[in-house]
Structures are given as structure tokens and as C-alpha cells.
Regions:
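Rhodanese-like catalytic fold shared by cysteine-dependent sulfurtransferases
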Residues: 1-107, 131-171, 179-301
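Internal catalytic-core helix/loop-beta-alpha segment
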Residues: 106-122
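Short, well-ordered loop/turn elements at secondary-structure boundaries
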Residues: 121-124, 167-168
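Structural scaffold elements adjacent to functional motifs in cytosolic proteins
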Residues: 127-129
Length: 301
């Protein structure tokens, strides 16, 4: 059984590059895989591995400057969620492209999962999903506004174009684990919105703690690992990935004429060139060859 830990923490790292070697070495030594992002604004990522390995890595992160109060969300999987370990240096741990946004200065009001339903059902509250369009497509909260953004970078422009729709409304925001809302609520406060709320722990904590019969969640929650999606109780869902575009697809989507394993699906068949598709086919061929040798090709991640 693999333990999965999703984490983020905003703090000040004077020299993120200096933190990378020891963190990567520890993960490799303890057979922990996944992706961790380091930037001057903090750390973000999801890792998976044996219980003892995850505990060792979390203890190491909590010992980093300003990370003693690190919080994370856990789940389990009976198959490895990641094929390799990456510790990457970034300008931002979640990219919004707004240099004046600083979640360490102020954020919206945190709302516990058990209080969320009452808030979003209030007539003076507008609920905004801050995730990307392909995530929203497989699940969201009842009544939520979908900005239809392809990237979190698009959110500020969407708000500027649509803010008049939310005049005199309290704003409630949510995302997968909470990190995007740290920035989006700070952004809205900076834009003069007076009452901004966000779901503490994100969708994942809500699904973990809220019984399905009391839930306002509809569908599945997209996750950035080999589980692809989870539902209530963080139970692994029915979705797979199209490895041509990385969008979630169902088993019945694989029966459609646009689907070719590792190459295309109905979402992306018209988005890639013949040259791209030829490259994807070669990649898929190498993955299949690795499988016949009992190996896992890194491109299969």
C-alpha cells in the first residue's frame, strides 16, 4: 500500500536551490516518488511511497525555515501513483503571474468543510471554481461558476472581464487542495472585494470528511497523479488519462473513433498535428516495449 501526501506551504526561502539536493536525496533514499516544487514563496507538491518514507520526508520539510506548521492531506493507493521523483525550482509554487499577490500578507476567510454547504447555498454568495476547465468538466460544487480557464494564469483576466456580475455578492472560492485559493482570494481582496471565503483544505478535505448523502459536490475531483480522479472518501474514480492531451476520459470514451491509446481522444484529436501524432505513436510504442520487458517507461507517468 502506498501513502500519498499532498502538501503546500507559503513561507520565505532565501535560497530554494540550496534546499533541493538534501530533499531529493532523502526522497530517493526512502523510495518516495512524486513532484515537489520549491520557490522563494514556499513549497508545493504531491508525493507517494511507503509510510515510513513519507513520514521521513514530511519531517524533513517541517524542519525547513518557516515550515513547522506544515499541513498536508493523505490518501492511499494500491498501485504506485508516480514513476519517478522530481524536485523542481520554480518562480512560483502555483503560477498565477501576479507579482503583487502575496498570500502571506492576507487571504480570504477559511471555511471548514462542515460549514461549506450552508455558505454556498446563501443567496448573497457567488461560488467560483478556480480550477482549469478540464478539471471542472468532471466535477464541481452545485451552483458553482466555471471561469472556463485553461490555466490559473487566466484567472485575473477572467475576473476583470466578469467582476460586474458579482457586484454586492460575497465570494466563496474553492480548488483541489487549497493552494490556488490562497492566491485567488488575496487577488480579489486586492481588487477591492470585501468578503472573500475559501474552502479550507480544498475539495480533497471536503470529500474526505463529508458523507456523500450530505454533500453538495457533484461528480469526481481530478487529481494530478495516476489515480486521475477521486470521489467521496477519496475513493479512486473511474477516469483514465488521454496521454495525448492529459485530459480525463472514461472507459466508454476509448470506444470512440477519435481515441488512439497514447495519441488522441475526442478532446484533442483536432488539436495536434500529424507530426505530433507520429511522435506520440513512437512514444506509445516504446512504452509497450518496456511493458513486455516488465519495466515501466518514464513516459507512461
Amino acid at each position: 500500500m502506498y501513502t500519498i501526501a499532498a502538501l503546500y506551504h507559503f513561507t520565505r526561502f532565501a535560497d530554494p536551490a540550496a534546499l533541493r539536493p538534501a530533499l531529493l536525496d532523502l526522497c530517493l533514499a526512502r523510495e518516495v516518488k512524486g513532484t515537489l516544487l520549491l520557490a522563494q514563496e514556499g513549497i508545493n507538491g504531491t508525493i507517494a511511497g511507503p509510510r515510513a518514507g513519507i513520514d521521513a520526508v514530511l519531517a524533513h520539510i517541517r524542519a525547513l525555515p518557516g515550515c513547522a506548521d506544515l499541513e498536508w492531506k493523505e490518501a492511499t493507493s494500491d498501485h504506485p501513483p508516480f514513476a519517478r521523483m522530481k524536485v523542481r525550482l520554480k518562480k512560483e509554487i502555483v503560477t498565477m503571474g501576479q507579482p503583487d499577490v502575496d498570500p502571506k500578507a492576507r487571504v480570504g476567510h477559511y471555511v471548514e468543510p462542515e460549514e461549506w454547504n450552508d455558505l454556498i447555498r446563501s443567496p448573497d454568495v457567488a461560488v467560483i471554481d478556480t480550477r482549469n476547465d478540464y478539471e471542472v468538466a468532471i466535477g464541481t460544487f452545485e451552483g458553482a461558476v466555471d471561469p472556463q480557464t485553461e490555466s490559473f494564469r487566466d484567472f485575473p483576466a477572467w475576473w476583470e472581464a466578469n467582476k460586474d456580475r458579482f457586484h454586492n455578492k460575497r465570494i466563496a472560492m474553492f480548488c483541489t487542495g487549497g493552494i490556488r485559493c490562497e492566491k485567488s482570494t488575496n487577488f480579489l481582496l486586492g481588487q477591492g472585494v470585501e468578503e472573500v471565503y475559501h474552502l479550507k483544505g480544498g475539495i480533497l478535505r471536503y470529500l474526505e470528511e463529508t458523507p456523500a448523502e450530505n454533500s453538495t459536490w457533484q461528480g469526481e475531483c481530478f487529481v494530478f497523479d495516476n489515480r486521475v480522479s477521486v470521489g467521496h472518501g477519496l475513493k479512486e474514480g473511474p477516469y483514465d488519462l488521454c496521454h495525448g492531451c492529459r485530459r480525463p476520459i472514461l472507459e466508454e470514451d476509448k470506444a470512440r473513433p477519435e481515441y488512439e491509446a497514447g495519441v488522441s481522444c475526442h478532446h484533442c484529436i483536432d488539436e495536434t498535428s500529424d507530426e505530433d501524432k507520429a511522435r506520440f505513436r513512437e512514444r506509445q510504442k516504446q512504452i509497450a516495449l518496456a511493458q513486455t520487458r516488465g519495466e515501466r517507461h518514464l513516459a507512461a507517468e
